[in-house]
């Protein structure tokens, strides 16, 4: 029997083609194809040593990285079914996935470990430590029809479902996109805004480079427009993959000079509007702009424009080895130019969902994508709409009814419809249309209350940030909601622009230097050193209050003091859009240039405040980003409080320094004893004198 294990076949292909020493990933260090496959084989041995075998299930919840690729390949090498999970999901979604898969092992990292059962979770770092001490394992002998991996759908018709793909499926993706659409070669470098847990991103950043000898730029944090521009200027990718929302932001916020190396642009996830496609053509200097359509069930793109033939406003043509047809409501084939449901048939289509009894395909092997399209005489496919009520925002399918059920729990709301609306840039965003339950109407405070509740109960990408009040919802003659009529509405202002009276009347959030100036020019006789120390402390308070105030506004919290300053932004309910918006607002408040990435780099209100304070002071050395608290696993308390001690040293008088230094030396002798309770006592201290008293009491010094 020929071994059709895809991990083994990809390693064999790299060896035979001479790619082993060629870059596979820039992350930012170079990782070669040979290192990827060798690491995967060693990790396969680790999984075998831990008792995992063919047919077991593993849940992978890791950020994009070469390490995720190696762990995925290790599972495939051993015949283990790997489920890919979005690490940015709400903890309830992760709990569902753990129950759904009944995984023998959950592989994740850092704070996410606390979200899963201790008996099954393992930190990926531990696996890599073990892999460094073992030799590579052989590849399990498998047929091409063996289950390989599964990616989750967006859950538009109920709970998310995992589409199971086989070992042979990968090579269908490669034939369709790499060979027929993109003409990828080992010289190509890809950069994808879509993540690896997403079927689109998995192909872009994993299967395509490994199967063609090309390489990919990967980043553990979300790749927004500005991040993409930075990565592109550094690594010079030739193919840029994304979704329409991403590309709309690229055109608005970036310089075309950063993307001079790009030879083609690939868009998928939702239809690319003609206007945006034309803007992209101008921005990128006339290179191919390739729109297409794919699905989680198919595994990647099956209809696309190509580098040889592309047309703005069209999804392109069907790519071999796939077949498509358009089906009219009566089940007959729709003629040229007639709108109908898009059906697809081909070798990579998942035959079933995990834990789902209903078949995916017809008896003839056709999958109904639920996309409505039409095809002209020459085979060009044009997108019309979704056949169901699914909203596609940022290339993610969202079930609006899940959101609507939560919103209508609010007594002030009689009816609600959540739809995707188009911003002026061409990007899509969720908006909730609210019908008041009484003549009192719905004001901004009610909208903020709804927004806060949604942030605590849904994954961030499902939460609408725009709300509009309407007298009634548009409906058909038989009472069915006309979502299409709402999609054309002008977007309302985002919730964070609906400033409450509390915010407008002087709550923290806007920097000024009046208090600080008063300290310097105070009437009492103080030394210059004391004045400068007081100024530094006041600046720290002002900056922290500004960040906390802006964060509270965006969350709709009337009292900034109620917001946890050490909790990760993701745990507060921020998604990528909100994090970027916060950076924009802080830039306006401080007059600084605040990169969009610092919200992720510094992770929390406290961390971001430290960064801004250093920038305002003109410090030569940038504050080192630190991990924010996420769930139960937080920045070690001792480390956090030592940072506080360091900040307060500016107020130490010269005469006190020897005494303080001696006591801190005594403290060093107790570090190995792990006295975390002492750090908790420091947390309650607010001045250097209080901290010194704690040191005195701890070590018995007078």
Curated annotation (Swiss-Prot):
The modification O-(pantetheine 4'-phosphoryl)serine is found at residue 576. Its EC number is 6.2.1.50. It comes from the Bacteria. Pathway: Lipid metabolism; fatty acid biosynthesis. GO terms for biological process: Actinobacterium-type cell wall biogenesis; fatty acid biosynthetic process; lipid biosynthetic process; secondary metabolite biosynthetic process. Transmembrane segments: none annotated. It is an enzyme of class 6 (ligase). The keyword Lipid metabolism applies. It catalyses: holo-[4-hydroxyphenylalkanoate synthase] + 4-hydroxybenzoate + ATP = 4-hydroxyphenyl-[4-hydroxyphenylalkanoate synthase] + AMP + diphosphate. GO terms for molecular function: acid-thiol ligase activity; ligase activity; phosphopantetheine binding. InterPro entries: ACP-like_sf, AMP-bd_C, AMP-bd_C_sf, AMP-dep_synth/lig_dom, ANL_N_sf, PKS_PP-bd, PP-bd_ACP. Keywords: Fatty acid metabolism, Ligase, Lipid metabolism, Phosphopantetheine, Phosphoprotein. Catalyzes the adenylation of p-hydroxybenzoic acid (pHBA) to form p-hydroxybenzoic acid-AMP (pHBA-AMP), which is converted directly to p-hydroxybenzoyl-S-FadD22 (pHBA-S-FAdD22) thioester intermediate in a CoA-independent manner by attack of the phosphopantetheine thiol of FadD22. This intermediate primes the biosynthesis of the phenolphthiocerol (PPOL) by presenting the pHBA starter unit for elongation by Pks15/1. PPOL is an important intermediate in the biosynthesis of phenolic glycolipid (mycosid B). NCBIfam families: PRK06060.1 (NF004716). This is p-hydroxybenzoic acid--AMP ligase FadD22.
């Amino acid at each position: 029997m020929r071994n059709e294990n895809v991990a083994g076949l990809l390693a064999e292909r790299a060896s035979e083609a001479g790619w082993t020493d060629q870059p596979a990933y820039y992350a930012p260090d170079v990782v070669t194809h040979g290192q990827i496959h060798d690491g995967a084989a060693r990790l396969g041995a680790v999984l075998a040593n831990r008792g995992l075998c063919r047919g077991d299930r593993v849940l992978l919840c890791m950020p994009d990285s070469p390490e995720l690729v190696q762990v995925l390949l290790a599972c495939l090498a051993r015949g283990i079914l790997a489920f890919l999970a979005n690490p940015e999901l709400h903890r309830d979604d992760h709990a569902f996935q753990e129950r759904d898969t009944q995984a023998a092992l959950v592989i994740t990292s850092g704070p996410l470990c606390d979200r899963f059962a201790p008996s099954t979770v393992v930190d990926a770092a531990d696996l890599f430590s073990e892999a460094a001490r073992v030799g590579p394992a052989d590849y399990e002998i498998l047929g091409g029809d063996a289950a390989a991996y599964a990616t989750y759908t967006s859950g538009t018709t109920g709970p998310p479902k995992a589409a199971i793909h086989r070992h042979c499926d990968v090579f269908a993706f490669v034939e369709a996109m790499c060979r027929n659409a993109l003409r990828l070669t080992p010289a190509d470098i890809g950069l994808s805004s879509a993540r690896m847990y997403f079927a689109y991103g998995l192909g872009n950043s994993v299967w395509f480079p490994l199967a063609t000898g090309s390489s990919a730029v990967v980043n553990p944090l979300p790749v927004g427009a500005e991040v993409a521009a930075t990565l592109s200027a550094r690594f010079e990718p030739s193919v840029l993959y994304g979704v329409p929302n991403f590309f709309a932001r690229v055109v608005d916020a970036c310089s075309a000079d950063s993307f001079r190396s790009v030879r083609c642009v690939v868009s998928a996830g939702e239809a690319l509007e003609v206007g945006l496609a034309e803007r992209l053509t101008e921005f990128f200097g006339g290179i191919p702009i390739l729109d297409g359509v794919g699905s989680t069930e198919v595994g990647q793109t099956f209809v696309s424009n190509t580098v040889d033939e592309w047309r703005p406003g069209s999804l392109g043509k069907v790519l071999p080895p796939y077949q498509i047809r358009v089906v009219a409501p009566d089940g007959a084939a729709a003629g040229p130019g007639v709108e109908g449901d898009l059906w697809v048939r081909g070798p990579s289509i998942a035959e079933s969902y995990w834990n789902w009894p209903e078949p995916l395909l017809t008896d003839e092997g056709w999958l109904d994508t639920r996309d409505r399209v039409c095809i002209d005489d020459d085979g060009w496919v044009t997108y019309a709409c979704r056949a169901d009520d699914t909203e596609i925002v940022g290339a993610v399918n969202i079930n609006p009814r899940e959101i609507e059920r939560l919103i209508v729990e609010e007594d002030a709301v009689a009816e609600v419809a959540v739809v995707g609306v188009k911003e002026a840039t061409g990007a899509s965003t969720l908006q909730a249309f609210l019908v008041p339950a009484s003549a009192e109407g719905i004001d901004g405070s009610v909208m903020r209350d709804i927004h806060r509740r949604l942030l605590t109960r849904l994954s961030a990408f499902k939460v609408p940030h725009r709300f509009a009040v309407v007298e009634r919802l548009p409906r058909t003659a038989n009472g069915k909601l006309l979502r299409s009529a709402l999609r054309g509405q002008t977007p309302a202002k985002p919730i964070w622009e609906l400033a409450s009276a509390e915010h407008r009347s002087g709550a923290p959030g806007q920097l000024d230097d009046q208090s600080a100036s008063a300290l310097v020019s105070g009437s009492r006789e103080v030394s210059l050193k004391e004045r400068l120390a007081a100024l530094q402390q006041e600046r720290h308070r002002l900056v922290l209050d500004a960040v906390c105030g802006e964060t509270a506004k965006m969350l709709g919290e009337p009292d900034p003091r109620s917001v946890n300053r050490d909790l990760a932004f993701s745990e507060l309910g921020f998604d990528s859009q909100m994090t970027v918006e916060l950076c924009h607002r802080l830039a306006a408040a401080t007059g600084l240039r605040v990169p969009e990435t610092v919200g992720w780099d510094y992770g929390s209100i406290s961390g971001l405040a430290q960064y801004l304070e250093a920038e305002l002071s003109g410090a030569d050395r940038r504050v080192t980003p630190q991990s924010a608290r996420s769930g139960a696993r937080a920045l070690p308390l001792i480390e956090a409080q030592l940072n506080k001690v360091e900040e307060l040293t500016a107020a130490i008088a010269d005469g006190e320094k020897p005494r303080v230094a001696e006591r801190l030396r005594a403290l060093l002798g107790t570090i190995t004893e792990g006295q975390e309770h002492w750090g908790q006592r420091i947390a309650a201290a607010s001045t250097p004198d209080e901290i010194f008293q704690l040191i005195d009491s701890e070590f018995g010094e007078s």
